[in-house]
A protein has these predicted regions:
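Phosphate-binding glycine-rich loop
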Residues: 1-8
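A short helix->loop->beta-strand "cap" motif at the edges of active sites that frequently abuts
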Residues: 7, 28, 86-90, 123
Length: 212
């Protein structure tokens, strides 16, 4: 919807199959490839061959992913970031298993090593953080999205025309899309999730160690 002609989502599999089911419900198209066969530098040629067609609106992947538990390396994330900027594609990172590559001691707030993310290499990103695995808080069905500031504030005429709003990406996403298609959750759940995030940020709890 941001850019006319960009009508497909590209999945780097394996990922969360429900995401494809959601696209099926709304009639959206997608392409997919298995990341196992395109690790490292090989990912560049594969992505370029798909993105160069000009019809991909977003790339989505889980990192780490389930069930293969493949963890993308910095080289691969840099490739994704570079090409998403080149072809104006939004990177959607599903971080349900945030910091859970236990080979590296992630989880210490504001201290290296920092969790890997394509957000280091592009401004076109949305990070999705579900509480289900991070805090084992699955029953309440709450999550958070983090939109890159440049993308959030970017104006798209197609969004303005479609939703009769400002056409600012972040405003359209929140007020004209998410508000309409999500059921929301109770205030108590929102406060609980916010408090768990704060305690983690303050270093009072170590959710990575708790989930190990």
């Amino acid at each position: 919807q941001r850019i006319p002609g960009k009508k497909k989502v590209l999945f780097s599999d394996p990922g969360f199959p429900i995401q494809k089911s959601q696209l099926r419900i709304i009639g959206a198209e997608w392409e997919e490839f298995d990341i196992f066969s395109y690790r490292g530098a090989a990912l560049s040629d594969k992505l370029e061959s798909i993105l160069a067609k000009g019809d991909i609106a977003a790339i989505i992947y889980s990192n780490p992913n389930n069930p293969a538990w493949i963890c993308l390396e910095e080289e691969e994330l840099a490739i994704i970031g570079r090409l998403s900027t080149k072809y104006d594609v939004v990177v959607i990172e599903d971080l349900a298993y945030f910091c859970m590559d236990f080979r590296t001691p992630f989880g210490k707030p504001f201290e290296p090593p920092y969790p890997p993310t394509a957000a280091r290499y592009t401004n076109n990103y949305i990070l999705m953080l579900s509480s289900s695995k991070i805090f084992s808080y699955a029953g309440q069905r709450i999550a958070m999205i983090c939109v890159g500031e440049e993308l959030f504030n970017r104006h798209f005429p197609a969004l303005e025309q479609r939703y009769n709003d400002s056409g600012i990406f972040g405003q359209s996403l929140v007020a004209s899309i998410l508000y309409m298609i999500t059921s929301g959750c109770t205030v108590s759940t929102q406060y609980a999730y916010a408090q768990m995030l704060k305690l983690s940020s303050d270093g009072a709890i170590d959710f990575v160690e708790d989930t190990r």
